[in-house]
Amino acid sequence: MLDATLKSQLKTYLERVTQPIEIVASLDDGAKSRELHDLLVEIASLSNLITFSADGTDARRPSFSLNRPGADISLRFAGIPMGHEFTSLVLALLQVGGHPSKASAEVIEQIQALEGEFNFETYFSLSCQNCPDVVQALNLMAVLNPNVRHVAIDGALFQDEVESRKIMAVPSIYLNGEVFGQGRMGLEEILGKIDTNAGARQAEKINAKEAFDVLVVGGGPAGAAAAIYAARKGIRTGVAAERFGGQVLDTLAIENFISVQETEGPKLATALEEHVKQYDVDIMNLQRGEALIPAAEGGLHEVRLAGGASLKAKTVILATGARWREMNVPGEQEYRGRGVAYCPHCDGPLFKGKRVAVIGGGNSGVEAAIDLAGIVAQVTLIEFDSQLRADAVLQRKLRSLPNVNVITSALTTEVLGNGEKVTGLRYKDRSTDEQHEVALEGIFVQIGLLPNTDWLKGTVELSPRGEIIVDAKGQTSIPGVFAAGDVTTVPYKQIVIAVGEGAKASLAAFDHLIRTSAPA
């Protein structure tokens, strides 16, 4: 299953293994079991420290466990972890084989101190770019603590479980048989949910921090660039981010970041964070801004965080980005994750052979419809305007597909369901005011982004669309408070533009520090 290049790369990685690894597969007579068998035999042939057997008795077939002789590690993949999950498999092999994790010593200690029984199950799809973060975090926890058990399950191969648990979005995480969470989660976020004292400990540590020269709020491309440019000036720099990478984490293919011909959002997000870590920057993850208290004359700005802590700084750069725009119609929140979705790449495979709608006729919506058409039975694209707004080449491709129906001049008015999952949607024909219903099982919302500025209302000046109004240097209406990226009024929401704006705001903040601290 592995081509020569991939096999060579994997062999090189496996040279880092220092302890023996046992791969035990549970297989049946199906084609997927044969595929998995061949893959595991191939992997075992690449290292003398790896042994393989097909003597497993697990009920999920095909599946396999990874263990270290004499250790109590419960780590299993149910399915064939290729696609986005191949990296998860490689990391699991390395970690079971004794190669140290990149997690901080503090996080490792926190994992090892967990008491109780934690039986995790994660449902993923091979095309989901959000799933590996969850799978890799829980795999590491299973390697480090015998109280943690983890099974990563390919929902496409175990449809009976997906149906019985009514899973309609990935990643979906279960703990001890109960729903634990849905969507991307990093290691620290998972630990924060099961280690109930973690939040209070973190807030105490944050409150004890000295004031920053530059505090960046947000960890997307704009925030990362701002932090690097500030740190390179040798000034005290901090980043408070809900999740490092921001909206980039939810982006699949990126082909317009200059000098990088092609990459994926999660890879770029990791690269951004690693670049920031090369400098003396205090990164505070899982921190969401709740209030901005502007400085009194000669004083410090204060950013209050949702976890109860607060930070002070001489200058602040707001780079909180944007989030998916919602339809705000009845039924949307009720059926979110139960048929209403926002990531076609992640959740599309769960709707194989079913009927879905895509809301939005811009590039994102049309691209989503094209992608989904290869998986689902029928796609209905619904656009509010009288015509699609996507690029002509995308529209031509869309209209060439036999299982796509386009409805324009349509206002979605309600998501319909049976109490458990989506069964359809209702829309109004804007030209006749007639109401129509479409029977379907999934709705993918692709209608743009909203700036994350709710917490800033009443402080910095906002545009009618809720964006932070900035001047040519990124200065907001509050002296010493700057903003950059998708959260601002700067047009064209692009990664490369956000990076430039972050750098510019940081340079402007440094200039402000020089001018306000200079002797009279």
From Swiss-Prot:
It holds the Pfam family Pyr_redox_2. It is an enzyme of class 1 (oxidoreductase). Binds 1 FAD per subunit. Gene3D superfamilies: 3.40.30.80, FAD/NAD(P)-binding domain (3.50.50.60). GO terms for biological process: response to reactive oxygen species. GO terms for molecular function: flavin adenine dinucleotide binding; NAD binding; NADH-dependent peroxiredoxin activity; oxidoreductase activity, acting on a sulfur group of donors, NAD(P) as acceptor. FAD binds at residues 213-228, 476-486. Its cofactor is FAD. Belongs to the class-II pyridine nucleotide-disulfide oxidoreductase family. Homodimer. This is Alkyl hydroperoxide reductase subunit F.
